[in-house]
A protein has these predicted regions:
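Active-site beta->alpha N-cap acidic-glycine motif
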Residues: 1-100, 186, 190
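Catalytic domains of cell-wall/extracellular-matrix polysaccharide-remodeling enzymes
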Residues: 47, 69-196
Length: 197
């Protein structure tokens, strides 16, 4: 997504928390349909580091999510968050050769979980990352796969039911969930058959 760009009839597929055991299958599906996505990656699963390179090589956007995804660590202070962010930024650069400057905060930029660790941390962090040239992105459509939804049919319904023709359609999904990967082909075909890019 770029400010000022017409977003009508566009669906932005975004995936958090990977790469993981199901990411390669997801990449195969995306490649089959020539669809590009944004991956907000983590650093704690070293078994799938090679997929960072594949994501980049296949034309996807790689954003930074968190190295540890440990709320109790990253949301205690600006310094703790920045250390974690720079760690995942360095890892992405190591595997892709590029320094990503786009991020998605774990829980989103207006999450309430972080208050448990420090009040006002999110407003402080959003200001800090922007001052350093980072851009953060949230979402407008929740697939439900981060919570109790483990049924691919429900994920498809959540996503397709949230899409609007004239709005910004940024879908939050997780490539570490097998049921999300099971749902993605139906989400893509819905979008393509209804004239979305």
């Amino acid at each position: 997504y770029k400010p000022g760009v017409n977003t009508a009839k566009t669906i932005y597929l975004t995936f958090d928390d990977g790469p993981g055991a199901h990411t390669a299958r997801l990449l195969d599906i995306l490649k089959n349909y020539n669809v590009k996505a944004t991956f907000f990656v983590t650093g704690y699963n070293n078994n799938y580091n090679d997929l960072l390179k594949r994501e980049k090589e296949e034309g996807h956007t790689i954003g930074l999510h968190s190295y540890s995804h440990n709320y109790g660590l990253i949301y205690t202070s600006i310094d703790a968050y920045m250390e974690d962010l720079l760690s995942i930024q360095n890892k992405v650069k190591e595997y892709t050769g590029e320094e990503s400057k786009i991020i998605r905060f774990p829980g989103g930029s207006s999450n309430t979980i972080s208050r448990k660790y420090r009040t006002h941390i999110m407003s402080d962090l959003t200001s800090k990352v922007e001052s350093l040239g980072f851009r953060y992105f949230d979402w407008t459509i929740v697939s439900g796969d981060a919570g109790d939804t483990k049924d691919s049919n429900k994920i498809v319904s959540n996503v397709t039911g949230g899409i609007t023709e004239d709005g910004l359609n940024v879908v939050l999904m997780h490539d570490i969930k097998p049921y999300t990967v099971d749902a993605i082909e139906r989400i893509i075909t819905f979008g393509l058959s209804n004239g979305y890019t």
